[in-house]
């Protein structure tokens, strides 16, 4: 006698088990496997609704009851006649869709273009103003600001060109006698590099 894992006799239950195993394998003719999908090739019904025709994988229309026969006859007659009106209608739909999409694309490009440019080119346009920008904004007409970085404030003010803040340039060793010398020095510092050696070479010669 064969005993199952659960302790039940296998000989007694062998025949019903085969019957139970064979019953679900038989397909039910009333309920096909893919009847839930609208595109079922077996039956084109969705819970009592019959689909008239499908277009581009979208459900176009469906009806029930007595209207189905009339619409089926109409569809049969339209299928027999050469379908010239349908392609024309579809081409019109495609053209209108293309023009609409191009219009939307143009509008999007117009709307988002100023915001997309900084992300592509870099962060220069969205850069926060620094202290050097403030210094340049004080004298925007000066042409030297494109040559090098911002100059210290003591150089921008002509009266204080000989102040102690220029010690890092070693300019305190120079003997400035006249105001014309200060103007020349300021001009040289603005239009040349901020190296004291070149200033000394210019003044010594």
Curated annotation (Swiss-Prot):
**What Pfam families does the record point to?**
UNC119_bdg
Q: Where is the composition biased (Polar residues)?
A: 8-25
Gene Ontology CC terms: ciliary transition zone; cytoplasm
What are the UniProt keywords, alphabetically?
Cell projection, Cilium, Cilium biogenesis/degradation, Cytoplasm, Inflammatory response, Protein transport, Transport
Question: What segment(s) does the record annotate as region Disordered?
Answer: 1-40
Q: Is Cytoplasm one of the keywords UniProt gives this record? A: yes
- Tell me where in or outside the cell this protein is found: Cytoplasm; Cell projection, Cilium
Subunit annotation: Interacts with unc119 family proteins; interaction preferentially takes place when unc119 proteins are unliganded with myristoylated proteins.
User: What family is it from?
Assistant: Belongs to the UNC119-binding protein family.
Q: Tell me, in a sentence or two, what this protein's role is.
A: May play a role in immune regulation through regulation of the macrophage function. May also play a role in trafficking of proteins via its interaction with unc119 family cargo adapters. May play a role in ciliary membrane localization.
- This chain's protein is named Macrophage immunometabolism regulator
Q: Whose protein is this, by species?
A: Xenopus laevis (African clawed frog)
Gene of this entry: macir
């Amino acid at each position: 006698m064969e005993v199952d894992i659960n302790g039940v006799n296998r000989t007694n239950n062998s025949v019903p088990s085969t019957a139970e195993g064979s019953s679900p394998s038989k397909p039910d003719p009333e309920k096909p496997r893919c009847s839930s999908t609208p595109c079922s090739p077996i039956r084109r019904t969705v819970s009592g609704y019959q689909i008239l025709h499908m277009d581009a994988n979208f459900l176009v229309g469906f009806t029930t009851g007595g209207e189905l026969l009339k619409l089926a006859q109409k569809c049969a007659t339209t299928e027999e006649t050469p379908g010239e009106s349908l392609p024309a209608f579809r081409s019109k739909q495609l053209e209108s869709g293309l023009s609409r999409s191009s219009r939307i694309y143009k509008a999007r490009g117009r709307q988002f273009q100023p915001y997309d440019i900084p992300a592509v080119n870099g962060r220069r346009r969205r850069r926060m103003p620094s202290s050097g920008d403030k210094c340049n904004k004080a004298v925007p007409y000066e042409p030297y600001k494109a040559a090098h970085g911002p100059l210290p404030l003591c150089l921008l003010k002509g009266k204080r060109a000989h102040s102690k803040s220029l010690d890092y340039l070693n300019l305190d060793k120079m003997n400035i006698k006249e105001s014309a010398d200060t103007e020349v020095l300021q001009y040289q510092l603005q239009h040349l590099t901020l190296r004291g050696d070149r200033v000394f070479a210019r003044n010594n010669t």
